[in-house]
Amino acid sequence: MGQRINPLGFRLGVTQNHRSHWFAQKKYYSEDLQEDEEIRNCIENYVRRHMKNYSNYGGIARVEIRRKIDLIQVEIHIGFPNLLIEDRGRGIEQLRTDVRNMLNSANRKLNISIAKVAKPYGVPNILAEYIALQLEDRVSFRKTVKKAIELAEQADIRGIQIQIAGRLDGNEIARVEWARGGRVPLQTIRARIDHCYYPAKTIYGVLGIKIWIFGDEE
């Protein structure tokens, strides 16, 4: 029987790096881990609230967190930083205030920086967010997937695989649809595979979107 494993965890330390960089004592480890998750959720919620309009999106690729004794460094890798707000400086300051209030700790410094992703549609998280917005706007899933593959191929990737599950186009019976472009060697450890899952909340229910992108080999 086949055994499934997360493609990112399977390659952790080979082609994938950790998103959190810190060390903690055993009794504080779970608290810091939960705090990292709350920081990421706070950033994602802030981005959604401050989008200029519904058709545009921030496109967060990943959030890296580094901790020191009295300092938390957060680096947001984002595809389209100009779509967030008009004044980026003021926006970062407001985001820092929101995160600090959520942490409820005045003894630690908080630094937040934004890094632009060079080829955003080559990142599965950004591409999945694009697909979800199209499906929520009732665009045909076949048309959406075809356009998504075209956008990904423009980012010089070697292969992409997309899975969408649920009541596609409002059909009564849920099903799973696949689409692939290029080569996606999931069993090759040295292959740089990026993967993500993203839910699309439509009027017919929730659709599950999974994307695998093959960038290159080590």
From Swiss-Prot:
InterPro entries given in the database record: KH_dom-like_a/b, KH_dom_type_2, KH_sf_prok-type, Ribosomal_S3_C_sf, Ribosomal_uS3_bac-typ, Ribosomal_uS3_C, Ribosomal_uS3_CS
Keyword field: Chloroplast, Plastid, Ribonucleoprotein, Ribosomal protein, RNA-binding, rRNA-binding
TM region positions: none
MF terms (GO), sorted A to Z: rRNA binding; structural constituent of ribosome
Locations listed in the record: Plastid, Chloroplast
Principal place of residence: plastid
Pfam family, one: Ribosomal_S3_C
Family annotation (NCBIfam families): rpsC_bact
Listed name of the protein: Small ribosomal subunit protein uS3c
Origin species: Ginkgo biloba (Ginkgo)
